[in-house]
């Protein structure tokens, strides 16, 4: 374990929902910071104003907190290295862009959008890769200064070396060498004064004293550019770690919007907000996504504290990871079973409230032990136990007919069970079950036939928590009323 406190960051753009890849990046950055007694920073990279989505920033912050990834510095809590929104750091980027120009590592570019379009079309006609042709790179500083003084609109481009190669080191991939001739002179400051990612992220990481940059492998293509920008300033490089990408469940390519929509129909999602609403737990989500790309056994069950103790960037793997929703179900169900009863009660209660049911804590506390082993998601509690809180149930009449029997015989059984239970002083487990088992034995019926009718009559479901424990919690009055209603429904079918 490293003894040097790490300063890590999660730097999303507020252009959409917090997704699985972002959540894993944040998780790894959080784990490394906590393990080394360092700091975890949230920075909002909102310079792409046109694509910024209202409410996305708040959703990111809410999602991180739901996952338990509390950040030490950020836009809503401040810190020593703020502001933490890039649109609020415009002057900082302008000053750094000016430094690059003055040192000869960048230059103003006055090319109009029309000229750039014509240039690219000509390159494509020649079957060349579209790239800036360096026209303004040839301008003298004096010429550029005159045009700027005249108010001519311009951007700032980074002057990539044209000779040799750039060797950049990634912590899990080793040295990456790329010939410089393959790179364009990228825009680092736009004409509106806002930076591009290439400048802003490098400046912010330095100014915020970030020691470890964990980000998606999608940035590998511009990794040499970023390294050159850092070196142009003469700064020490952070430890770069490019994380593996997530593939769709088939392992072939990234999940499309259509496939993400299909996953929702099956009760899964790649978006944190959806996972919360679908009843997944932060413990299950962290465990699941954390192990995708982390070289530890894929069945290891860990909470955040255990993950902090075991995490190491040395164990991260560069290989793409296929999303496995069955694993999510496994981990989520496991963590539900590990939750203390009081905690689980608090987590499932909102699902009953949302369905318009008044679920009292005392009754939920009785019910939770009956549900825990059957639950995969928190909202399973509503499906499994909604009948406890309804005045009545409305089973499908055909479900009341026992296997191998007809409606008249099933109605007869329902009436007889009603009569037996009316004669019981209470419907406790200890009182009701022996009485009904005695009836089964003397009638010569199959226990599954009798108990099946009772289960559907009382719970409205073919599958439910343990029957007699459920009857005791529901209470004598409701149980008898539901049996009576079932007998009448079966009689109508006769």
Task: Map each language-model feature to its residues.
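Structural motif
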Residues: 20, 275-283, 318-324, 358-367, ...
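Glycine- and acidic
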Residues: 8-14, 42-46, 208-213, 269-272, ...
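Charged substrate- and nucleic-acid-binding regions of tRNA-handling and nucleotidyl-transfer enzymes
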Residues: 429-490
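Active-site cores that bind ATP or allylic diphosphates and position pyrophosphate for catalysis
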Residues: 107-108, 112-262, 271, 296
């Amino acid at each position: 374990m490293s003894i040097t406190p790490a300063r890590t960051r999660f730097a999303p753009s507020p252009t959409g929902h917090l997704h699985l890849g972002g959540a894993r990046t944040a998780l790894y950055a959080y784990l490394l910071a906590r393990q080394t007694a360092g700091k975890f920073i949230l920075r909002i990279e909102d310079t792409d104003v046109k694509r910024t989505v209202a409410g996305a920033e708040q959703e990111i912050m809410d999602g991180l907190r739901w996952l338990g990834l509390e950040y030490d510095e950020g836009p809503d809590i401040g810190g020593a290295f703020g502001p933490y929104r890039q649109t609020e750091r415009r002057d900082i980027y302008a000053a750094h862009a000016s430094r690059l120009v003055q040192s000869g590592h960048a230059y103003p570019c006055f090319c109009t959008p029309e000229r750039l379009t014509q240039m690219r079309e000509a390159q494509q006609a020649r079957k060349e890769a579209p790239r800036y042709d360096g026209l303004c790179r040839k301008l003298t500083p004096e010429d550029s200064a005159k045009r700027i003084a005249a108010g001519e609109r311009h951007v700032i481009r980074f002057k990539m070396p044209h000779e040799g190669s750039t060797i950049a080191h990634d912590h899990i991939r080793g040295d990456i060498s790329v010939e410089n001739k393959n790179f364009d002179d990228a825009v680092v400051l736009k004409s509106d004064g806002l930076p591009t990612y290439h400048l802003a992220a490098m400046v912010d990481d330095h100014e915020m004293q970030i020691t470890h940059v964990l980000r998606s492998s999608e940035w590998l293509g511009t990794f040499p550019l970023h390294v050159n920008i850092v070196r142009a300033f003469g700064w020490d490089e952070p430890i770069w770690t490019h994380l593996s990408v997530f593939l769709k469940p088939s392992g072939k390519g990234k999940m499309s919007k259509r496939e993400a929509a299909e996953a929702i129909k099956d009760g899964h999602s790649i978006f944190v907000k959806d996972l919360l609403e679908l009843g997944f737990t932060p413990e299950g989500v962290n465990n699941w996504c954390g192990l995708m790309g982390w070289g530890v056994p894929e069945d290891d069950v860990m909470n955040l504290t255990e993950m902090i103790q075991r995490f190491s960037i040395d164990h991260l793997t560069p290989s793409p990871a296929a999303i496995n929703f069955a694993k999510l179900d496994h981990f989520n169900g496991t963590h539900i079973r590990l939750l203390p009863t009081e905690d689980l009660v608090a987590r499932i209660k909102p699902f009953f409230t949302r369905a318009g049911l008044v679920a009292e804590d005392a009754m939920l506390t009785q019910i939770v032990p009956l549900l825990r082993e059957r639950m995969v998601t928190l909202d399973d509690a509503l499906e499994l136990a909604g009948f406890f809180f309804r005045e009545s149930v409305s089973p499908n009449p055909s479900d009341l007919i026992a296997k191998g029997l007809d409606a008249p015989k099933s109605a007869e059984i329902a009436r007889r069970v009603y009569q037996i239970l009316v004669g019981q002083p209470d419907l406790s487990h200890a009182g009701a079950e022996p009485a009904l088992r005695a009836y089964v034995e003397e009638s010569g019926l199959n226990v599954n036939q009798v108990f099946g009718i009772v289960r559907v009559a009382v719970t409205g479901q073919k599958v439910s928590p343990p029957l007699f424990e459920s009857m005791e919690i529901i209470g004598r009055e409701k149980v008898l009323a539901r049996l009576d209603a079932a007998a009448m429904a079966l009689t109508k079918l006769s």
